[in-house]
Structures are given as structure tokens and as C-alpha cells.
UniProtKB/Swiss-Prot annotation:
Organism: Klebsiella pneumoniae (strain 342)
HAMAP family per record: GcvH (MF_00272)
Protein name: Glycine cleavage system H protein
Subunit structure: The glycine cleavage system is composed of four proteins: P, T, L and H.
Record-listed N6-lipoyllysine modification sites: 65
One GO BP annotation of this record: glycine decarboxylation via glycine cleavage system
Function per UniProt: The glycine cleavage system catalyzes the degradation of glycine. The H protein shuttles the methylamine group of glycine from the P protein to the T protein.
Cofactor section: (R)-lipoate
Cofactor note (record): Binds 1 lipoyl cofactor covalently.
Annotated GO CC locations: cytosol; glycine cleavage complex
One Pfam family in the UniProt entry: GCV_H
Family indicated by similarity: Belongs to the GcvH family.
Length: 129
């Protein structure tokens, strides 16, 4: 079973979301998603300053197996991207919940966060797959 940290929120598309002290949210893909994709070779990051809608594709993770869209779990403005992934995309594999984060977003609608899955609901989703 994949590691599913209890303090995070999750999307059905296997992105995770963590609220930061400054009120922004850090987003990445889950351990389950990176296991399915395999070894990352490139991450196409979103543009800082871009406004995205919840559910819209905003980045791409390319692995040795496939290229997979990464979706914004909430609407808002991209305020930072993980530049480390340009040289070390494998961080998504080795540390998906920390050093392998993909972007940070400033929410335009906090209510969307509450609508995401908690760890228990995400684990149930994984069991159904």
C-alpha cells in the first residue's frame, strides 16, 4: 500500500495538497501516482503567475513509461514552481511529498480545498482501483 500522509488533502487524479504557513498550497503527485508512472525523466512545470482552474491540466510529468498531465486540485494563481525538478526530476520518485513537490498555488476559492479527499477517502479510492 502506498504511503498516504494524514495531514494532506488529495484529488481523485492523484495530486496532493498541503497548506503552508503563508496561506499558499504546495501541490505534487502522490506516491501511488509516481509508482504507476515509473522513473521520471522530465517535469514540464507551469508558469509562475498563471491562473488555473480546478481540474485543469497545468503541468506534465514525463517518465520512462508515459507522459501524464498534472491537474490543479484547486483554482488559483501559480506562485512558485520547483526549479529543482529541471535538473532532478527523479525527486518526484524519491520524495513525492517533500522535495518532489511540483508547484505552489494561491487559492482563489478556499471552499475547493474542503471538497478534496482526506487521507482516509484517498486510501479507499486506491483500494477501489
Amino acid at each position: 500500500m502506498s504511503n498516504v500522509p494524514a495531514e494532506l488533502k488529495y484529488s481523485k487524479e492523484h495530486e496532493w495538497l498541503r497548506k503552508e504557513a503563508d496561506g499558499t498550497y504546495t501541490v505534487g503527485i502522490t506516491e501511488h501516482a509516481q509508482e504507476l508512472l515509473g522513473d521520471m525523466v522530465f517535469v514540464d512545470l507551469p508558469e509562475v503567475g498563471a491562473t488555473v482552474e480546478a481540474g485543469a491540466d497545468c503541468a506534465v510529468a514525463e517518465s520512462v513509461k508515459a507522459a501524464s498531465d498534472i491537474y490543479a486540485p484547486i483554482s488559483g494563481e501559480i506562485v512558485a514552481v520547483n526549479e529543482e525538478l529541471n535538473d532532478s526530476p527523479e525527486l518526484v520518485n524519491s520524495d513525492p511529498y517533500s522535495d518532489g513537490w511540483i508547484f505552489k498555488i494561491k487559492a482563489s476559492d478556499e471552499a475547493q480545498v474542503a471538497a478534496l479527499l482526506d487521507a482516509t477517502a484517498y486510501e479507499a479510492l486506491l483500494e477501489d482501483e
